[in-house]
Amino acid sequence: PVDYLKDVADAMMSCEFGVIYFGLGLTQSLGRFRNIEVAIALARDLNRKTKFIISPLRGHFNVTGANVVFAWQTGYPYAVDFSQGYPQFNPGENTATDLLRRGDNDATLIISSDPGAHFPASAIRNMMKHPLITINPDMNAISRLGDVVFPTPRCGIEYAGTAYRMDSVPITLKKVVEAPPGILTDEEILTRILAEVRAIKVKRGEPVGQTEVQPPAQKESVKESKPCKT
């Protein structure tokens, strides 16, 4: 109703500091990232009257950390496609859900996540048609479906690292107890996988790309810490 919308607008304009949190209801419904553009425009207009910010409402540990690392390495926070040899950003086309629902994958690597409990059934069915590798600290739904399963210790408990708060502030996490013998961190596992991939490409005479990606200069608190993989 129009009267209700007027009440909402009055409440937003009369507050001293407002926050618009958005989630999958905007990003995965009709319109996709265009919905976010409208929400950003709303926040911009509200700042003419009062103080307003907009932020995604993330639901799992260190999701912001993954977005921050993607952003400083590629310039884009997520939905990054490297198939052309350089990063391309196309939300609504290149997100994991979109790729899996279309069946574009021929293998899937899951790192510290559980799409088996959250992704649409059509995406999971297409994922299961091809090799599935999981790197997870928990035996969750997707780990039980994996063809290859790598257990890992928990960041902030069994090894030190950095996690990012929902407002992108880095928090240093300390090691509390020793990890079980022989259990590698996700960083160590990925480093070994990358080394094997590059060795195979060298044997085939294929270019191996950059040996190391250097992020741009960050604040000292960020540069001194390693983000936990998510």
Language model regions located:
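Non-catalytic alpha/beta scaffold blocks inside enzyme catalytic domains
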Residues: P1-K51, G75-P77, D81-T230
